[in-house]
Amino acid sequence: FFTLLLLVAFSVNSYSQNSTSSPYSFYGIGSLDFRGTTENRSMGRLSVYNDSIHMNFKNPASYTGKNLFIFNDEGRLVKFTVGLNYNETKLSSNNQNSLASNTSFDYLGLNLPMGKFGMALGLIPYSSVGYKLESSNDINLIKYKYEGLGGVNKAFLGFAYQISNNFSIGFDAKYNFGNIQNSAIEFLYDDDNQPLDYQSKESNRSDLSGINFNFGLIYSGTIFKEYTLHGSFAYSPSYNLSSINNRTFASVVFNSISGLDFPINQIEVDLESLDLYKTDLVMPNRLNFGLGIGKEKKWFIGSEITTINSSVFSNDLIDIENSKFEDSYLLSLGGFYIPDYASFNKFFNRVVYRTGVYFEKTGLNINDQSINEFGISFGLGIPAGGLFSNINTSFEFGKRGTKKADLIEETFTNIHVSLSLNDRWFIKRKYN
């Protein structure tokens, strides 16, 4: 228990670190960060499959299930999972390239069985902001410099109930919290194209909070005697994030060697008089449906679609020209294969081999160009530390964006590692 508290404290602190270097995190509340657990990501971000030893944050109905009723109903597994992420991105425009990387804490979750009920709690990221951008004038002098960091995280508590052998339902409540900071420096030059002693800087900070809910339904049933049909449905209604905003203007001295700027005079804008001190960000609803088929502890293949009405998103504080949000979707196809789950003399026969592919319309439109993302993934589920615990890995390779209309194309590699710990906490002792 003490170790769990340390992990929670560490994760909250680690969430202050940037997990993205994408220039597209400049828009909205940043790049959507959480795409599922390591297992989900290794199957093309597929979440329709559920089992007794892995958590599924995308559908709260997974917090219980008939596959938890093992050991003659006496030792249902308590599930704990923690994940880490490494990202490397090549940023390419029509005239230059750059490389960026980030390492971050990914997620933390605990799932407790309670008879036909199940309870889960955890901490996951939602969005991340992390960019440094420059724009130049006709003679290649820096005109503007933009920088942003922060993001939104979710702490959740959920419950599920096993209706029958085939159906389970669930819901969770998520508390959203975080902040986003961004700044812009405008560079001015004299007649000899030398930078002036003082430049002007605008800084914005938004502290965000709010609650949203997620509802889920899961089906699992036998067909053709030896195969299992899996179905899932999840819905998250639209909600508002409350934003407390602060804006300052300053004259700064810029050090071209260190890249740091030092404020000389700073003025805080009276946002309250502009009715912008406290604003509400309208967040979209989300609908997810998945279907798959497999043979228990042998193989599985499934597909999934997630739709988001991103066009309703609004932020009164910041209005960026030539950009808008449009409705978005995610298509996933993936699965896994286990050579021999019961093998005890050949280790690699018990390894889970996962792979998948996905396409996402992100919902961001810049200069009349829809920003899309495509990726392939694969990963392993490696038995570790006992019969039920395992280490999971995921490797994602993909592209986001375009070079058209003076935009940026990202080529990225995401590496995820997670630890799934499973144990029997509630066992009825028997004596002869």
Where in this protein do the model-derived segments appear?
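Bacterial Sec-dependent N-terminal signal peptides
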Residues: 1-22, 432
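Subset of outer-membrane beta-barrel
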Residues: 17-432
